[in-house]
Amino acid sequence: MIHLGVTQMNLLYSHQKLNNRWIILFIMIMALWLGMSSFSTAESPTDAIIKEQAEHLNTEPVEQYWDKLMKDYGGYFPESKTPTFMELLLGTKGISMKSIFKGLLRYVFHEIIINGKLLASIVILTIFSMILETLQSSFERNTVSKLGYSITYMVLIIIAINSFSVAIGYAKTAITSMIEFMIAIMPLLLTLLASMGNVTSVAILHPLIVFMIHSVGTAIYVFVFPLLFFSAVLHIVSSLSDKYKVTQLANLLRTISLSMLGVFVTVFLGVISIQGTAGAVRDGVAIRTAKYITGNFVPVVGRLFSDATETVIGASLLVKNAIGLVGVVILIMLCAFPAIKILTLAFIYNLSAAVMQPLGDSPIIACLQTIGKSLIYVFAALAAVSLMFFLALTIMITISNVSVMMR
């Protein structure tokens, strides 16, 4: 009897233990299901950190450039394709390269239509000057025709020089906007770099980039554009007379200006890339050492602190890359629209020279061709400067990626 009672008690205890296991298993399954459902409906911790960092950053200095671009040129893009700055930054609403190209193409046609008046004026004045030039050889008393030809020729020269000055003004305005934009976006990128532990890179790049941007911009204003302007003027003066030519001096000034531009771009990119990469390597080694020491020698919370720091650094990296990519888009658009204006003017003058050439060989045609070629050089200078800032911004984006790879 005693043995039977013990056996029943054991069976009852086993049954109760089995029920408890089933209850525990049911609770674990319910907890796992609830956790999965909440995970599917809520955002991940990394996304929350990214959104929080983006909202706490002072993006107003950069955002005003995007707002100004949309105010000035947003009409060339479909309204549904122009997101706000924060939508572009967080990726909730983007802008495709297709819509950008469509907007730029619309702007090209708009500029061609606007400059059609300039084309018509140049063609009419050129035809009128050729008629007066023909009258000079048809009559013995050609004083009036010579005077009319000279006045017409001077009017064309004034129009050409004025167009060239306007093009240089477009280029200077674009370069000034890009310099100010680079100065505005640097604190954002450097702050995120510092939050990722890239203290050495920030200490090196902050004064270096500010100094190089201002130095290169000032040098282009003081040397490159004035030399291109004087080169164009000397070419025009050389077309006035067959006896007195200064084309060699004009070509020399043009060569010097383009050579100086190449030197500025090379020095700027070389210094920033070398110093930035060296700083990124040092930061990567330092952060990796600190992470190893924290994770292995700090008891209990060391590994947890190391993983949390890694999550924050990864979120900062994503935010920095997003800001960098938005900055690249803004930088391209700051350069693209003035560059289109300059290219349109160059196209107008080259087209005028091509249309007028079958009517006869005239100094005016050579003058128009010279202005068109000089405008192409102004565009090349603007494109080189924008490429320099574009690569500098890309280097800034890549620096933290190098330090993360080192970790």
Task: Indicate residue ranges for each PLM-predicted region.
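Helical hairpin unit composed of two closely spaced alpha helices linked by a short loop
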Residues: 321-362, 370
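Small-residue-enriched core segments of transmembrane alpha-helices in multipass membrane transport
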Residues: 146-157, 178-186, 215-221, 252-266, ...
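Gly/Ser-rich, low-complexity
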Residues: 2-28, 32-125, 130-149, 163-173, ...
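Membrane-helix cytosolic exit motif
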Residues: 341-349, 353-357, 361, 376, ...
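Extended, low-complexity, charged alpha-helical tracts
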Residues: 181-185, 192, 354-358, 362
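Generic multipass alpha-helical transmembrane bundles of integral membrane proteins
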Residues: 205-330, 334
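Mid-bilayer segments of alpha-helical transmembrane spans in multi-pass integral membrane proteins
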Residues: 150-163, 182-199, 219-231, 236
